[in-house]
Design a protein with these regions (language model features):
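A structural boundary/capping signal
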Residues: 2-10, 34, 38-239
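N-terminal Sec-pathway targeting helices
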Residues: 17-25
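Bacterial N-terminal signal peptides
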Residues: 25-35
């Protein structure tokens, strides 16, 4: 497993974590890489996606899928900064926030992009997953994207209330400060402009990075099975 570099201003390198956490982190990173390899090598199957969308969600779902495909087609020639803006705006505009219990009758469910577009709703994880997979489809390298679990401060700068949250980080280079794509706010901001977010750990299709937070409310090991299940369902839907 290669040594991963990460912006020291926001997330600390996995090697700075406690030894036990570091060993577990590397094992999880390897498992993420193995179960993600098939997805990374896959190509989009628009016909299959449309057939699945039609059978599950009808004409409304197909209409949004068509809009998503048109957004992708019109964004392919753009630079990466413009691509992340187009994708962020698309999902923040078309998807409404709804919790998993209301949508799926489960306490924690990771929806595929097709499911999220089909019901036009999702929680923070669903927004992030849909944006991540859309940007991979637009050709942004995996190593420039991270799904990041954070503790989000709710109620202003003086508030002591935090909740578990997920955002997408875009890294223009290995040492760059990440730009944060979030469903809580419409604009894309650098991490330094988001003091309301406290990073816990992050991952992508290559591995997982763990910081020093002792207050993590999102166990990385519990997420691996959901990630594997998500990738399997994504493939079945033609992504």
């Amino acid at each position: 497993m290669p040594v991963h570099r990460i912006n020291s201003l926001w997330l600390k390198h996995i090697s700075s974590a406690r030894p036990v956490v570091r060993v577990i982190g590397y094992c999880i990173a390897l498992a993420f890489a193995l179960c993600s390899a098939l997805f990374v090598a896959a190509e989009l199957n628009p016909q299959k996606m449309q057939a699945v969308m039609q059978s599950r969600y009808g004409s409304d779902g197909v209409a949004l899928l068509g809009a998503w495909n048109r957004m992708l087609d019109s964004s392919r020639s753009l630079d990466n900064r413009e691509k992340i803006t187009q994708v962020n705006d698309f999902f923040n505009r078309h998807i409404r926030y709804t919790d998993d219990v209301t949508l799926w009758q489960k306490s924690d469910y990771w929806a595929t992009p097709l499911e999220t577009m089909g019901v036009r709703a999702g929680d923070c994880e669903d927004f992030t997953i849909a944006k991540y997979m859309s940007l991979l489809e637009l050709g942004i390298p995996t190593e420039q994207l991270r799904l990041i679990y954070v503790r989000a401060q709710i109620g202003g700068a003086q508030s002591k209330r935090f909740q578990a949250h997920m955002v997408l980080g875009y890294y223009s280079s290995a040492d760059a400060e990440p730009l944060i794509l979030d469903n809580l706010i419409s604009r894309i901001e650098p991490a330094s402009k988001r003091p309301d977010l406290r990073p816990v750990f992050s991952f992508n299709s290559e591995g997982l990075w763990v910081g020093n937070s002792a207050q993590s409310q999102a166990d990385p090991t519990a997420r691996l099975s959901r990630w594997r299940d998500l990738l399997a369902r994504v493939r079945e839907e033609g992504f």
